[in-house]
Amino acid sequence: AILPESGYMGGYTYSAGFGERDAWFVTPLFDADSGAPLALLDGASMNPFKTGAAGAVGIDYLARTNASTVGIIGSGAQARGQLRATDTVRDLSEVRVYSPTRANREAFADEMGNQLDCEVQAVDASADAVVEADIVITATNADEPVFDGDLLDPGTHVTAMGQYNPTKRELDTTTIERCTYVPDLRERAMQDAGSFIHAVEEGVVDESHIHAELGEVVAGEATGRETDDEITVFDSGGTGIETVAAAGMLYERAQEDGVGSTIQFAPASEALTGR
């Protein structure tokens, strides 16, 4: 992705698919004018913070201003990133977390309860997290919906960020049908947003159900939440723009704080000619 306004370009480069071996994410950042390399970042470590920040923007523009209770499904690094970022845009009073493994959800509750100025409790079912929550966050690798959309109270905001595969989904058709649907990218909603694609295939909604991209709402080109009773969904699959913007910010902070190691790359004309 290229950000002409900031002068940066870059994106994720990663290796994966080597059997059961791990994956590695690297984020190179370049000068968009000269093409010169500026920084090389650990993309995997950056990702939960970047993705959490995108989720927080969605909450800031789509959740009720007085939203204070959060139900979160998932207890991994992405769930932690989402909750930390959410805490920066809303005054949270209570968080309820569910994930299938009791030890994981209890560890999440203990850790995040120590970090946030609110109560964080582990619950025994996804329904217990969702019912009466002002904000619901899903950060899972589930293949099928993780809660019943009929449980959502009017006025709830949902951030779904764990699944961007056309055959998998975190949200059921009821949730999509009831909501004002805002993806990060309109074209992605029809390509790999499994929750939305399933609802289309079931004949419940069509492409016109996409209210706007989040960027359009932020830019004032489309409305966000219009009523307190409205159910809103931000379907976050991640974008190259988010990655480059986050990398650019970290690069600038590193320069200001004098952190990081400097390495030199020879331009191709020099390396290949020896001049």
Q: Where are the regions a protein language model picked out?
A:
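Glycine-rich adenosine-cofactor-binding loop
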Residues: 55, 63-89, 93-104
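Short alpha-helix adjacent to the SAM-binding motif of class I
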Residues: 107-111
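N-terminal ligand-binding/catalytic initiation module
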Residues: 1-46, 56, 66, 212, ...
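Rossmann-like adenosine-cofactor binding region
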Residues: 117-202
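Adenosine-phosphate binding glycine-rich loop
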Residues: 169-273
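Well-ordered mid-protein domain cores that form the structural environment of catalytic cofactors
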Residues: 52-58
